[in-house]
Design a protein with these regions (language model features):
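Short hydrophobic/aromatic helix or loop-helix immediately within or flanking a transmembrane segment
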Residues: 55-105, 371-376
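Membrane-interface transmembrane helices that cradle and orient dolichyl/undecaprenyl
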Residues: 172-183, 215, 219, 454
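Transmembrane-helix signature of polytopic, membrane-embedded enzymes
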Residues: 107-111, 127-149, 167, 417
Length: 491
């Protein structure tokens, strides 16, 4: 099927690919439930609604039904440490699910699954709108397929906030690339209250603003590294906002095409010989040219460079952003950073404990928050106090190789900065466990970087999709199903 010229609307194609991938995940999830032993949450072979209620799904249910503890109800152990509580879970997803359950007088988990599926569909559309101008229609559809068939993608249809959070991030970046700053701010603020991603979001936007300020001053705009973020491809079929993108693309190509000298020569050679006509009269002798003036001629101004087509994403532009765009970008970054700090502030106000939010987040690991320390300790637990350091070094090298991939950089400056900031955020603050696979869903552009390489190689693409489905089977069995086989991990 030629997706570039298909009569089916592209968004419907995206939803079709998403639906097929999600239904495969649903089948795997339900089959995995048949092998699930008795757990803390249910008896063996749980029903679908019992199965989706495992792990942190219960915490979102508590947020929806009990809210957040105050200074009296905040759990504090005998050692003075804050215990596990709902402040670790942002409110928007839980309140949406709980509000829908009250409105319909329905089961909470039924409504939570509905919200998760809707969020997953929005995430597919948002990711396509973000990535399509950078990779084209065909590669973007393949990116949707690759992403939604990867192992932890099943979590996007379960009662977790991941699907809604990812949708808000993707939509925010998509509209920001089109200079819709106000809508981007709305999306990023909502995302900061859906998942704890406000810090890397604000950092990514702030670093991009600094980058653009340096480019505008000519400090890095001529570097080869900066040039590597400007794709040499213009995907005229990719703009998700302009209704006339095909006409705009044709106009842009026509305005930038060189003069066809061969055609001009051919037309001259086939022109009729006017001198053979009886009515031909000799031309008068040419006038003697006037002596050159002492005043040098004024040179004609150099032709202005061709403007980029309106559908070029803002962070792919080879030219620095305007001062107006940079100002709006700074405001967007500032608003996002403020949103990231608001939730810890609300926890402080409600509990009277300044570090209530951070203490809650670290309650699951049992130690205070220290940058990078969790990765060092975890590497020691996996490989030993000495050999584990080598494993940690390997993780850092692998991270550098992935983030330095040229194909990822060609998705745009902001896309690359976001992936770097979020990845570094996990390395600094996250306690590594099998949950890291779920956390890495936020660097979804990696799937589109892979898709660009595979879009013209159908066998390789099919192999990658098959591996993705296999990892979903392993994720359900090893991670979600709580010991259905010998390996016990947590989502």
């Amino acid at each position: 099927m030629d997706v570039q010229h298909s009569s089916i609307h592209h968004r419907l194609q995206v939803l079709a690919v998403w639906a097929i991938a999600s239904l495969i995940g649903l089948l795997i999830f339900n089959l995995g439930g048949l092998d699930t032993p008795q757990t803390y949450w249910s008896a063996a072979k749980p029903s679908y609604l019992q199965h989706v209620a495992f792990w942190d799904s219960e915490w979102y249910y508590r947020v929806a039904t009990q809210g957040y503890p105050d200074s009296i109800s905040l759990p504090i152990g005998q050692d003075g440490r804050v215990g596990q509580n709902t402040w670790a879970f942002m409110p928007i997803y839980a309140y949406l699910s709980g509000g829908l359950a009250k409105l319909l007088s329905a089961n909470y988990y039924t409504c939570a699954v509905v919200v998760a599926w809707l969020g997953s569909a929005l995430a597919a559309l948002g990711l396509d709108a973000w990535m399509r101008p950078r990779v084209g229609k065909a590669a973007s559809l393949l990116g949707v397929a690759i992403f939604f068939t990867c192992g932890p993608a099943i979590i996007l249809q379960l009662p977790y906030a991941e699907s809604l959070g990812l949708a808000l991030v993707a939509i925010g970046f998509a509209v920001l690339a089109k200079r819709r700053f106000a809508w981007a701010m709305v999306a990023f603020v909502l995302a900061a209250f859906t998942r704890p991603i406000g810090v890397p979001l604000g950092a990514a936007l702030g670093l991009w603003w600094v980058w653009e300020e340096l480019r505008a001053r000519g400090l890095i705009s001529t570097s080869r590294f900066d040039a590597s973020f400007s794709s040499d491809r213009v995907y005229a079929d990719a703009d998700p906002y302009a209704a006339n993108y095909e006409a705009a693309a044709a106009s842009y190509v026509a305005s930038t095409a060189p003069v066809p000298n061969e055609a001009a020569i051919a037309s001259f050679e086939t022109a009729p010989d006017l001198t053979a006509s009886s009515s031909f009269e000799a031309a008068p002798p040419a006038a003697v040219p006037a002596p050159p003036s002492e005043t040098p001629p004024i040179p004609s101004p150099a032709p202005a460079p061709q403007a980029l087509p309106s559908f070029t994403p803002m962070d792919l532009s080879p030219m620095p952003l305007s001062s107006k765009d940079r100002l709006w970008l700074f405001v967007t970054a500032a608003v996002t950073c403020a949103a990231a700090l608001t939730w810890p502030l609300l926890a402080w106000i409600a509990t009277g404990r300044m570090s209530a939010y951070v203490d809650t987040e670290t309650a699951w690991r049992g130690v205070d928050l220290a940058p990078f320390e969790a990765w060092i300790n975890r590497s020691a637990s996996f490989g030993g106090a000495h050999a584990g350091v080598i494993g940690l070094f390997g993780v850092l090298v692998l991270s550098a190789c992935i983030l330095g991939w040229r194909q990822l950089r060609q998705l745009g400056r902001l896309t690359w900065i976001w992936c770097v900031c979020y990845w570094v955020y996990l390395l600094i603050f996250f306690d590594p466990s099998s949950s890291v696979f779920r956390m890495l869903l936020m660097v979804a552009p990696l799937a589109w970087a892979v898709a660009v390489k595979l879009v013209s190689r159908p066998r390789a693409a099919l192999a990658v999709l098959t591996v993705g489905v296999v990892t979903q089977v392993l994720w359900v069995a090893w991670v979600w199903d709580y010991g259905s086989i010998s390996i016990l991990w947590v989502p």
